[in-house]
Structure formats: C-alpha cells, structure tokens
C-alpha cells in the first residue's frame, strides 16, 4: 500500500479507488494479525501526553450505513462518530463494546494494535489535515463499501500519531491543533489562606452542582420507571439493558429527549434523590463510619471518623475528598483522600512525641481506641470508683494498654474488626463523641492536673464532664435563664473546672484554655490579625475587626453563642465592623468587656506562674564613689542594641564581649561603635576558660533565635532541636559567668524570647533559669506591636512600662516629611518583607503622592528606636536592613529594663 505525504492531493478519484481495491486483501490479512497482538502496543505508540478516543466500531445492533460528516455542512442526520471540534480534535464519546467475533473485538475502541502511522492512503491524509476522517462515498453506499470505508477510517487514524508529531513543529500558532488548556489543580480542604468569600462561592457552586445532578437523576429515574411499567406492569430494580443507554448518539433506538413527567412527580423524585444520593461513591474507599488518620498542615497525623456532610451542617464534599470528624475536639474538616490512612496504619501514623506533649492528642488517641476496641470486641479493664487522681491514673494505664494493642495490629480480629457496623454507616445517624465513645473517655485528662476541681459533697463523680460545643450551649442557656453564674463556667470551652477569670470578658477560664490563651494571644497571621479567636483561642471561621489599629478576631461560634443568634451575620454585613474590644458599648449580650482589661491582661501574663521559684537576690545600690564601669557579655548580640542603650543611659562600659555569627550584624556593630565591641564568634565555641579569661562580667544578656520556638512556625522543632537548643548555650555560659560563692558584687542577667511559644517550652526555660518571665509589649513605648518575654534579675522588671517625651508613640512621628501614616501603630515587624503590610486588606502603612508606600529603612529604624541610618552600612539592601531590624530588640523597652543599672555602675 503506497504511502502518501501531505502534498499528494492531485491523485484522481479513479486511481484512489484502484489503490484501495488492490490493497483490500492486504488490509484484511493485516487486520487478522493485528487482532492477535495485545492492545497494549497501541498505547505505547504516538503522542504520550494526549489520550484520544477513536471512532466507535459499528456493532450488530447499529445500522450498517456509515454516517459521513463534511466540514462545511454538519447536520444532525449526517453526524457520525467523529464530529469535528473547533480545535480539530475528535469528540470524546463512549461507544458500545464490540461483540465477540466482530472485527474490532480484539482492539480497545477500534484502535490499531501496531504499525501506527506507517502507510496512509491519500484520502486519509486529506481527511486528517481537515481534522476529521472524511471519505468520498455518500451515505447511500452499499454494505460492502461501508466495510471499505471502515478500513479507510482505521487507516486514517493510524497515521494520526505520526502526523501529530509533525503538526506544530513550526509552532503551536501555525497548527490546526491549538495549545492545550493549562491544567488547573484544586487543593481539597479549607486552607487558612482562603478567604471567606471565595470559600462561600465554592460551597455554593458545589451545592448547585449537587442539586442539578440530583434533579437529572430524578428525571432519568422517572423515565426508566415509566418505561418499565409500560412494558412489564411491575417495578423492576434491575438496570436497563446496555442498548438503551444513551452512549451512541447515532443509534435511532435511543430516545435522546426524556418523556414529560408531572411536576409533582418531578419534585418528589428530586427531593428523594437529593436525600438518598449515595455519598463518597468515587471508588476511592473511606466510607461513612470508617476510622482513619488524617493529615492537615502543621499537625501530626490525627485520628478521625468519616462522616456525612449532613452531620456538618455544610455542603457536600467534592469528589476525592471526605468530611472528617476529629477525635479530641469534635471539629470537622474536608480532607482529600490522599491525606487519609486507615486506622490500621497505627504503627506508621502514631506520633509518640506529640502524644507526650499535647493533651488534646492524647485525648484523641484514647477516644479512637475506645471506639476501635468496642468494634473489635476487645475488652480492657475499666476505671475503678475512686477519686479523680486515681481515675486519671487508671485511664493512663488503660490508654497504654490500648496503644500496645493497636501497635500490635489490633489482634486477633485485625483491620477487619475495625469496620463500622451497619447502623453507623447510615449518613443521617447523629453520631457524636459522647454517643459512640465509652463514658470513661470523658475521664481522660492530662495528668497531673494543674489545679484539682472542686468536688461535690453529695457524691463523688465517677468521670469528668464531657466538654463539647453542646455542653457550652447548654450552660450558656442556663446563664441566660438566670440558673447559673457566668463566672462559674469557662466561656472559652464550657468547662466547669474554672481556675481563674477571663482577662478580657466577664466569665471564667479553665486551665487548658489558659494555656491556649498564653500561647495564642500574641500569635499573628500574615495579615497582621490574631490567628485565633480572642475568646476561645480557636474557631473555624473568624470575624476580623475593621478598626485599623485593632488586630483581634472573634469566631462565629462564640459570637452567636454569647452575643446572640444572628450576631455574626449582622457583623459581617456591617462594614467597617468594630469588634467587642474596641466598640463604644461594653456589653453585647452575655459578652461583657471588663473595664480594667489592660491591667488584667498584663497581670495574666505576669502571674502565670505554673512553678514557684525563690525570689532573685536583691542587691543594694552601690554608693556613687564606689561605682565602676560595667563589663558585659552579650550572646546572640545582633546589632549591639545592648551597648547602644547603655551609652544612651550614660553608663560607662569597660568591656563589651559579643557573640554573633551574622556578618551584616557584625559590620553594623563595628562601624557604629568604632571597634569597641570584641566579637568572639559562635556561642558554641566559647568555653569556661574563655569566660574566666575575659571576665569577670557584671551583666549577661542574650536572646536565642526564636524560629524553632515560635508556634507561628508550623515546622518548629521545639526547645530541644534545631536552633531551640541554643538556649542551653546561654544557660551554660550564664552559669560559668556567675560570681563565686562569697562574692557579693552585683551581677545581673537578661534573657529574651517570643511570647508565642509553647507552654511546655516556656515552662522548661523557666525551670532552667529558676525564674518566671515578664511580658512587655513595645506598643506602650513605640509605634509598633512587639510582645516579648523577658527572664532576668534586673531590679524593677515588673514595674509599669512608662513612655518618655522622646519616645515616638505614633507612626506619623517616625515618617519623613511629606508622608502620611495610614495607621497609628504597625504590626510586629519581622524578617519577612510582607510584615510591613497592614490589616486584612494588606495595605501599605504610608500614603505619599496619592499612592500607598512601604516604610523606608530610616522610618523603620525610628520605629525601633534606633538612630537614623544606624543600619546603613556596607551598601546593604533594604531587605537586608529589615532582616537586621526584625531580629533586634526594641530600644525603648531595653532602656526601660536597663535604667535601674544606673544605681550600680559608673555613669558619664
């Protein structure tokens, strides 16, 4: 069979007819050989990146006359299996499976098995050039000619792969086949950076699609039922035969338009289909009721249970995703199936370090293993009737036994024993934690308790209360009915184990919520707002205050519960919305702001003493004639903020030894202090011998890197890994620099780090330093928010922070001439460039020449209290200078802490 190129279009019709007749026998023989070859060969040839569905092969049920379509006159009657698409591609349509024994039975979709694109008739070349298989025969051809036409179409499709590789070689723009559309990916779940408006749009679109699909299914069901009743006069549940499926648009036996259905029947069927439509039927597993492990960003693998969308009160999950109800807190999330594992993968998903540190994770493990043991019929010893401390120990022992059972593979039943029973597979069964967890699950609490709750005098409760959103709703309802005092319940979670008062609003707070508040109160997102709700330090959806100088958030759950039903929607419609902390009124339903909340908030962080230490040694002031210059050891020195403040206070500095590894920071210190700083390199290379050689020291200061301590960093490694371990270098050198026994000379030290650190890390630092920290926010003495913890023995660290006349408290005071501040104070400036942007709309803080502008480096230096151009050395870029400032201390705060040292050391 002669091959033809793109230019062989002048051959006459008679010659093409002779060629086809001469090669007909060869093609039939070749077809027999091709049917014996495996169909996988066809998949390996041609363009790998594009999957094409070949024209369907006629079966015995379809008419024998081929339907031919021309490019200029497409009609409904002449449309064939390969209708022309605008981009020249073949329309992808499903075709009936060829019967056994038909010529195409051995091939998938009628595609050739080998020799693709080797020899092509001239008419096939022209047809493919036009983007469709076209022949010269009309629709009145005989059955024999139909077979020849089929062979010609198959041959034309053979050379499609080789032609496709040539097409577009000079550029996609000159090709008939246009550039494919870019693939759009969709990340399932609710990432924190998706705005509420976009999330609502997605949910509304999913809901519309689900309703539309339900209506179509209802109509099709009605059509099938009417057809079945007309044929057999009885209801048949079997599916209709394959020939009646609308897969072949050219088949005259298929009705393409559904018969009219009554309005009542249509509505009834639509409602029934919307309720009874199967859920999670995408063939990817993880059905309703299954126990799974789920992965969210920033969290370890967490145990959960697959639930129906009906339980969540939201819309259906998209295809390939599942609604998961998490154990421990009972919240819901949409998780893609790639981020799910069965509970039987306990050995690979269970994280021992998280179990040791996080009480909520321990509670979640306890709850899921309770459910697993109940399903598997595995019995564990129950908690005995005793006081609460013994109950907690019994729960601890039981939890350990269940974990060992899970790590052993859930024997003897194995993973099969974890399958949900039939009643839990019902999507409309309300299954909450307190219904499918044994009552002992509520007894679990992280031992030892910080403070024992009050015990009832009438009887000893066997277990603690079950705390969830419904518990808080019930207690708040009792408060509204004047049956309970709001100070007796934790307004954050609903617990009755109140240990202190909420620092901002009238109401109580439990120990767990106190720990969360300590961690999250000063944790901010990239938009400058709090990461969590001001009331409960949680919340799935939060309302952000519209006041530019306020950075607080309130979750919808707390607002609707404490302020009143519908208050959240009213706040959303109000623009701008002033939150309950900066509003004019002090009372909003049950949410009443405390009048003295600023001092209470300060005392909340100052008196959060989980551990009691002996008060630091108090040194009496040194007489003026006996005062000597100070000798300082500065670890993690940065840009020499300590030396700058000592000079500003007029304190004479005898020696300033600094440990720093950043070259830019060292350059700034050397240039601005004229070589008076002795740099000693990495803090890990400093030994006790060096301390004795350089000392004695009167003041040791430092602040280790906070990257692995701040809970803002989801990949943080904690105090004992990464840069967190550098704290122990400070502790080691502080111990070496302390005066010997019998030496009563004044000795002071100061250690600084972020407020947004884990409670356990803060507790460990305090235990090593044998001191509790004080929290100081630079917003009281500067134009920027910057809350930090300070440990030390400096005199008067707890005294109120007072500004001076030289402090620039407003951003406008820090700007150059002709520039207008849009905010009175800026958010915490960090090493990241986007920390300059302010508010939920990410505005730049300065307005100049009718345009928004960023802070200049000189203005940032004024915000931190540094002299103008303090970091302007060695041609450093703006970002490099911002990184230096983002790691530094606030000068007014350090001046406030160092001021009492004037009573002990010589001054100029």
From Swiss-Prot:
One Gene Ontology cellular component: nucleus
Residue ranges of domain ADD in the record: 478-610
Alphabetized InterPro entries for the sequence: ADD, ADD_DNMT3A, C5_DNA_meth_AS, C5_MeTfrase, DNM3A_N, DNMT3_ADD_GATA1-like, DNMT3_ADD_PHD, PWWP_dom
EC number: 2.1.1.37, 2.1.1.-
MF (Gene Ontology): chromatin binding; DNA (cytosine-5-)-methyltransferase activity; DNA binding; identical protein binding; lncRNA binding; protein-cysteine methyltransferase activity; RNA polymerase II cis-regulatory region sequence-specific DNA binding; RNA polymerase II-specific DNA-binding transcription factor binding
TM ranges: none
Subcellular location: Nucleus; Chromosome; Cytoplasm
Chain spans, region Interaction with the PRC2/EED-EZH2 complex: 490-582
Domain SAM-dependent MTase C5-type: 630-908
Modes of activity regulation: Activated by binding to the regulatory factor DNMT3L. Auto-methylation at Cys-706 in absence of DNA inactivates the DNA methyltransferase activity.
Pfam families in UniProt: ADD_DNMT3, DNA_methylase, DNM3A_N, DNMT3_ADD_GATA1-like, PWWP
Main localization, broad class: nucleus
Extent of Polar residues compositional bias: 1-13, 69-80, 242-256
GO biological process: autosome genomic imprinting; cellular response to amino acid stimulus; cellular response to bisphenol A; cellular response to ethanol; cellular response to hypoxia; DNA methylation-dependent constitutive heterochromatin formation; epigenetic programming of gene expression; genomic imprinting
Comp. bias (Basic residues): 44-54
Catalytic activity: a 2'-deoxycytidine in DNA + S-adenosyl-L-methionine = a 5-methyl-2'-deoxycytidine in DNA + S-adenosyl-L-homocysteine + H(+); L-cysteinyl-[protein] + S-adenosyl-L-methionine = S-methyl-L-cysteinyl-[protein] + S-adenosyl-L-homocysteine + H(+)
Modified-residue entries (Omega-N-methylarginine), positions: 167
Family: Belongs to the class I-like SAM-binding methyltransferase superfamily. C5-methyltransferase family.
Function: Required for genome-wide de novo methylation and is essential for the establishment of DNA methylation patterns during development. DNA methylation is coordinated with methylation of histones. It modifies DNA in a non-processive manner and also methylates non-CpG sites. May preferentially methylate DNA linker between 2 nucleosomal cores and is inhibited by histone H1. Plays a role in paternal and maternal imprinting. Required for methylation of most imprinted loci in germ cells. Acts as a transcriptional corepressor for ZBTB18.
Domain remark in the UniProt entry: The PWWP domain is essential for targeting to pericentric heterochromatin. It specifically recognizes and binds trimethylated 'Lys-36' of histone H3 (H3K36me3).
Subunit-structure text: Heterotetramer composed of 1 DNMT3A homodimer and 2 DNMT3L subunits (DNMT3L-DNMT3A-DNMT3A-DNMT3L). Interacts with DNMT1 and DNMT3B. Interacts with MPHOSPH8. Interacts with histone H3 that is not methylated at 'Lys-4' (H3K4). Binds the ZBTB18 transcriptional repressor. Interacts with SETDB1. Associates with HDAC1 through its ADD domain. Interacts with UHRF1. Interacts with the PRC2/EED-EZH2 complex. Interacts with UBC9, PIAS1 and PIAS2. Interacts with SPOCD1.
Listed name of the protein: DNA (cytosine-5)-methyltransferase 3A
Organism: Rattus norvegicus (Rat)
